[in-house]
Structures are given as C-alpha cells and as structure tokens.
UniProtKB/Swiss-Prot annotation:
This is Uncharacterized protein RC0134. InterPro entries: Cytotoxic_necrot_fac-like_cat (IPR011324).
Length: 165
C-alpha cells in the first residue's frame, strides 16, 4: 500500500518517472516479476509458443490452463474466465496439437475465495477439470488452485517446463 501511496504522491508532483517506478514495483509485489520477453496472454484469450516463455496475469477467479507437449515443446496457455465456454479448450486449444499428442497440463488459479467470488472461482475450476478429464491424452501434472498464496501472474518456459510466478 505504501508504494501505491508513494506513486500517487509522485503523480501529483508531476514526477512521472518516479510515479511509474513506484506503481510498477507495487504491481510486481502482487503479480510477480514482469517478464517483458514472454508472450502475454490476456484474460479470455489463448496463446501458443514453442520457444518463447508464455504467461498471463491477474489470475483471481480465473484459471490459467497450460498444455505442453514435452517432445515438441509446443505450449498453449488459456486464460479461462467465467465467460469462457469449456468446450473451447477442446476446439481452440487441444485441436491445435496433432491427434493423440500426450499433453502435460498445469493449472493455476481459482484463488479468490471471498464470499462474493467463490462460486465463480469454483465454477471455473470445475469446467476446466471436467473438460480436461474428457481427454485421455491430457495428464494434469500440477494444479495450484484455490490457493490464496498462489501468484496472480505466471510465466511458463516451454524449453524447461518450468512454471513460475
């Protein structure tokens, strides 16, 4: 909070560079360090990469779904929100891999456990896991869900299969 207040104070003094630095630092404390080299996937979108790191942020009620082919390194990241049709994981993501490709899945999110948001978080988790379990070739390697301590932003490296936040 102090960094946000300091950023606001600098802003009122027209000290733009100082203000931006404070806001950026505050953001990194919540979201994790921003990797400007990574392919960025926005909410309700899908991205693909086979060499460059790929990531998303602001994972509150949403679920980040990472599907990774360990042989070719091709990786998809879907930022699933409450408006995402569960079948789009099949139509827009899994269908972009060759048939029967063995995929490793990593799930992060559904972390907002507040009274107002818990049903949205749980609904997103449910639709993602139900859709993925319909595919024999998808192996869920990790699921960091319902964890308030989980990062709000993640980066996945297709080369090393490392997910960090």
């Amino acid at each position: 909070m102090a960094r946000l207040a300091l950023g606001a104070a600098y802003k009122t003094q027209n000290r733009k560079e100082n203000s931006i630095a404070q806001y950026a630092y505050s953001y990194s404390l919540q979201q994790g360090i921003v990797d400007y080299e990574a392919v960025r996937v926005e909410q309700h979108k899908v991205g693909f990469s086979d060499q460059e790191k790929i990531g998303t942020d602001n994972i509150q009620q949403c679920v980040a779904v990472i599907l990774h082919d360990p042989l070719t390194k091709k990786t998809a990241l879907a930022h699933v929100d409450r408006f995402t049709y569960a079948g789009s994981l099949t139509h827009d993501v899994i269908s972009n891999f060759p048939p029967n490709t063995q995929l490793e899945a990593y799930l992060v999110g559904g972390r907002d456990r507040s009274a107002v948001s818990i049903s949205v978080s749980d609904g997103n988790i449910r639709k993602v896991t139900q859709e993925l379990t319909n595919h024999f070739n998808v192996n869920i390697k990790s699921a960091d869900i319902e964890d308030k301590g989980a990062p709000l932003g993640i980066i996945f490296d297709p080369i090393t299969s490392n997910c960090s936040g």
